[in-house]
Regions:
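N-terminal Rossmann-like NAD(P)+-binding subdomain of aldehyde/semialdehyde dehydrogenases
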Residues: 1-125
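Generic structural signal for well-ordered, non-membrane alpha-helical segments
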Residues: 8-11, 26-33, 41, 48, ...
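Terminal amphipathic helices with adjacent charged low-complexity linkers/tails
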Residues: 56-57, 272-274
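N-terminal small/polar loop signature for handling phosphorylated ligands or for N-terminal nucleophile
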Residues: 97, 169-180, 197
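Conserved small-residue-rich beta-alpha loop and adjacent elements
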Residues: 109-174
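Conserved NAD(P)+-binding/catalytic subdomain of aldehyde/semialdehyde dehydrogenases
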Residues: 180-269
């Protein structure tokens, strides 16, 4: 934990250095991400395998090893205890109900001149969902992104999530089954975003990429936007809490921890009075 005091003579220098460091890091990362995207776009599965071995530590030699069979997702769901399964299914049902109210429908009418006017609304054909799987696994990210796509009528939902230490979190697999994911790949980072954006022989190109990720994922989504749609640039997480002494410090600490856990680039700041 780093502590800055506005009473210190070098406070302005410290705060400026803190902000500048983030900008410098972002520039360097953007160049590395661009190289990864170019490699996957140009060499497809071969580059995807190389980056998955080097960055995710997954021992893969064939593109087919990257895909998770639907039966494996279903088995993970069946293996959950009753409470875990009920929690996932209840969450999915609540998200599904909310998304149904959000769903936009087409309409048309005929004006007084005999012209037929209206709006045609069609679901996307294919959507890619990114679910973090490095330092922590987030089955909630699977549900919050895949279930609305299913409600919208998307034909094919592709989930990508890195396998931490060669293992996919069973709750992520189970959430994929609950959410109706059609295909899943154990790939992550900028290379996964590139594969979804441009496609490879194994991973189909999608119309839109959704879901949160670390700085690499955020930078990659920013760079492929235009080639493919994205939801937003989510991450790295930043939160600033202004403490006025009116709240239980434990609550503040929990809020800070909730953001700081996302990745090493997350920033959880507390502004307080001396």
């Amino acid at each position: 934990m780093r502590r800055l005091d506005s009473a210190q003579a070098d406070f302005e220098v410290q705060i400026t250095a803190l902000l500048r460091a983030a900008a410098t890091r972002d520039e360097a990362l953007a160049k590395q991400v661009a190289d990864i995207i170019q490699a996957v776009r140009g060499r497809g599965d071969a580059a995807l395998l190389e980056y998955t071995r080097a960055l995710d530590g997954l021992d893969v030699t064939e593109p087919g090893q990257l895909e998770v069979a639907p039966a494996r997702m279903a088995a993970a769901l069946d293996a959950l205890d009753a409470d875990q399964r009920d929690a996932l299914e209840q969450a999915a049902e609540r998200i599904r109900a909310y998304a149904a109210h959000q769903k936009v429908s087409g309409w048309q009418y005929q004006d007084t001149h005999g012209n037929t006017l209206g709006q045609l609304v069609r679901p996307l054909e294919r959507v890619g969902v990114y679910a973090p799987g490095g330092r922590a696994a987030y089955p909630s990210s699977v549900l919050m992104n895949a279930v609305p796509a299913q409600v919208a009528g998307v034909d094919e939902i592709i989930l990508v999530s890195p396998a931490a230490k060669g293992q996919v979190n069973p709750l992520v697999l189970a959430a994929a089954a609950v959410a109706g994911v059609n295909r899943m790949f154990t790939i992550g980072g900028a290379q996964a975003v590139a594969a979804l954006a441009f496609g490879t022989a194994t991973v189909h190109a999608v119309d839109k990429i959704v879901g949160p990720g670390n700085a690499w994922v955020a930078a990659a989504k920013r760079q492929v936007y235009g080639q493919v749609g994205i939801d937003m640039i989510a991450g790295p997480s930043e939160v600033l809490i202004i403490g006025d002494g009116s709240v239980d410090p434990d609550w503040i600490a929990l809020d800070l921890f909730a953001q700081a856990e996302h990745d090493e680039d997350a920033r959880a700041l507390l502004l307080g009075r001396r």
